Curated annotation (Swiss-Prot):
Name of the molecule in the record: Tropomyosin
Entry's free-text remark on domains: The molecule is in a coiled coil structure that is formed by 2 polypeptide chains. The sequence exhibits a prominent seven-residues periodicity.
Native source organism of the sequence: Clonorchis sinensis (Chinese liver fluke)
Protein family (similarity comment): Belongs to the tropomyosin family.
Disulphide bonds in the chain: none
Functional note: Tropomyosin, in association with the troponin complex, plays a central role in the calcium dependent regulation of muscle contraction.
Stretches with biased composition (Basic and acidic residues): 29-42, 111-136
This protein's UniProt keywords: Coiled coil, Repeat
Length: 284
């Protein structure tokens, strides 16, 4: 009888210990589940941060590409403007050369005209002298007539030369007027080109400023990208560490659940043994 009582007391103590361990296991299990839930929440937040960082990185890369495209387009416009300026400069140089040629031709024609005028004046003076001599000396009339004819021929030849010089002068004047028109057009174009050059210069200054700002923005973008990349790597490392901790907690939870199940089985066995012992005592 004493042995049965001792056995009952021992079984009761073991039952109480088993219940206490079961309560501890349940508390630990609850704590581990809370920790696991917390870690899963942290993993979700990290995933959201990683997605946000990736989105920001994509936006920055897109903005950087847009800036590079704008810089390329601006450089292309500046190159085209420089080519246009060079082309117009060549045209101005050709016009200036044409004007020099026309001026030279005009000077040459005027010189020939002066020479023809002098020849005509000399012929006229010779004719008048012949007329005077013919009046003064009847005997030399025939000679004077010959001289008069010669003078007339010289005068006619001078007139022809004068007409030819006048015709050439008219042509030169037309060429000169055209050259003046081209010169005026060239001067107007020069003014226009100077204005365009001024605008291009201002645009180039603006482009240089924009390029400097773009370079600064690019450096800022690159720094932001590096920062985001580091943050992304850190977030990935934290996420991996959190997943490892969750896996570890899951293993601990599984182990605690196994221990709790074992304790419940032991408790059930002890309860069965106590019931059997009570039945035996009742039988006595």
């Amino acid at each position: 009888m004493d042995g049965i009582k001792k056995k009952m007391i021992a079984m009761k103590l073991e039952k109480e210990n088993a219940m206490e361990r079961a309560v501890q296991y349940e508390a630990q299990l609850k704590q581990k589940e809370e920790e696991q839930e917390k870690k899963e929440t942290e993993i979700g937040e990290l995933n959201n941060r990683m997605k946000q960082a990736q989105t920001e990185l994509d936006e920055i890369q897109e903005a950087l590409q847009d800036s590079l495209n704008k810089m390329e387009e601006t450089d292309k416009r500046a190159t085209n403007a420089e080519a246009e300026v060079a082309r117009m400069t060549r045209r101005i140089r050709l016009l200036e050369e044409d004007l020099e040629v026309s001026s030279s031709r005009l000077t040459e024609t005027l010189a020939k005209f002066d020479e023809a005028s002098k020849t005509a004046e000399e012929s006229e003076r010779g004719r008048k002298e012949l007329e005077i001599r013919s009046i003064a000396d009847d005997e030399g009339l025939s000679q004077l007539e010959d001289q008069q004819k010669e003078g007339k021929y010289i005068a006619e030849d001078a007139d022809r030369k004068y007409d030819e010089a006048a015709r050439k002068l008219a042509i030169v004047e037309v060429d000169f007027e055209r050259a003046e028109s081209r010169l005026e057009a060239a001067e107007s174009k020069i003014v226009e080109l100077e204005e365009e050059l001024r605008v291009v210069g201002n645009n180039m200054k603006a482009l240089e400023i924009s390029e400097q700002e773009s370079a600064q923005r690019e450096e800022s973008y690159e720094e932001t990208i590096r920062d985001l990349t580091e943050r992304l790597k850190a977030a990935e490392q934290r996420a991996a560490e959190a997943e490892r901790q969750v896996s570890k907690l899951q293993n601990e939870v599984d182990h605690l659940e196994d221990d709790l199940l074992s304790e419940k089985i032991r408790y059930k066995d002890l309860s069965g043994g106590l019931d059997q012992t009570f039945a035996e005592l009742t039988g006595y």
